[in-house]
């Protein structure tokens, strides 16, 4: 979703919310939470508050009138009823015959509510310096995780990674072969953004940064001499991230045409730009997702930018066998998250079985 539309939607949801959610929103902006995260959370709050009114737990006439005491007094049984409602309500997707929403959606809803409750019971300071209330019912509600071993998840993900020489083959395909099948009209659009698209893909494959981190890069954040980029990680921390040297020519090519191609002036600080009717703007996450999906599907299999992050992490672990190094590269505080990559490249177990 484009930034302007996203902000418009956020304002629309904010206009519906009670005062304590607006305070929460303002507080999380300072962390900072991304606008995308806050938008998703506001959607979940709307769903939850509508249920409170429809179920009779709140007698408010509208969401904005819901009293904070309603949240304080919610019981574990109430929250379990809400989860049951999510599991059993008819799907809003016309093409789906499934009842209820997915477990992933339920977990996201509970995560959003946990964040709100933590703010109200621990983080906020009222006039007396104390939180608005102390009873956090969300601490009694557990989320159900998908039952899947790391080995099973690794095998599933492995099919969607560009490992070994496929990393460079993918870049070469976009640069030299993708255009062959295109119509003249499609070629015109492709040529306009070819250098930019290659630079973005190369940056993702060479650094493993998150999509949001790539989108928010400014010109000042990239040092091609040192092959380092400065990014804002989750939680707002600044971090310096190394890039593999294979990305340098793609980034140099893009930077050489950036200003003229995208009509960029001094005030246009974003690294990756789009241009519409002579006006440059920072590229948004959805545009990169569509772009990566389009090229990867034509090359081998449709993947997301996050799979390019997995690709870099797996290749780095394969080369170093160091989970610590991989976790630092990805911006993770612990090595637990990187356990997945040890399973993706675990050929020793297969070799041992072959030798039986």
Swiss-Prot record:
Keywords: Cell cycle, Cell division, Chromosome partition, Cytoplasm, DNA integration, DNA recombination, DNA-binding
Chain ranges of the Core-binding (CB) domain: 16-121
Localization terms from the record: Cytoplasm
Domain Tyr recombinase, residue spans: 169-354
GO biological process, any: chromosome segregation
Keyword DNA-binding listed: yes
Any one Gene Ontology cellular component term annotated for this protein: cytoplasm
Gene Ontology MF, one: DNA binding
Inhibition and activation profile: FtsK is required for recombination.
InterPro entries documented for this protein: CB (IPR044068), DNA_brk_join_enz (IPR011010), Integrase-like_cat_sf (IPR013762), Integrase_catalytic (IPR002104), Integrase_recombinase_N (IPR010998), Integrase_SAM-like_N (IPR004107), Recomb_XerS (IPR023670), Tyrosine_recombinase_XerCD (IPR050090)
Pfam families documented for this protein: Phage_int_SAM_1, Phage_integrase
Domain of life the protein comes from: Bacteria
Catalytic machinery residues: 210, 234, 306, 309, 332, 341
Main location: cytoplasm
Assigned protein family: Belongs to the 'phage' integrase family. XerS subfamily.
HAMAP family: Recomb_XerS
Function: Site-specific tyrosine recombinase, which acts by catalyzing the cutting and rejoining of the recombining DNA molecules. Essential to convert dimers of the bacterial chromosome into monomers to permit their segregation at cell division.
Name recorded for this polypeptide: Tyrosine recombinase XerS
Species assigned in the record: Streptococcus thermophilus (strain ATCC BAA-491 / LMD-9)
Species classification: Bacteria, Bacillati, Bacillota, Bacilli, Lactobacillales
Gene name, Swiss-Prot/TrEMBL: xerS
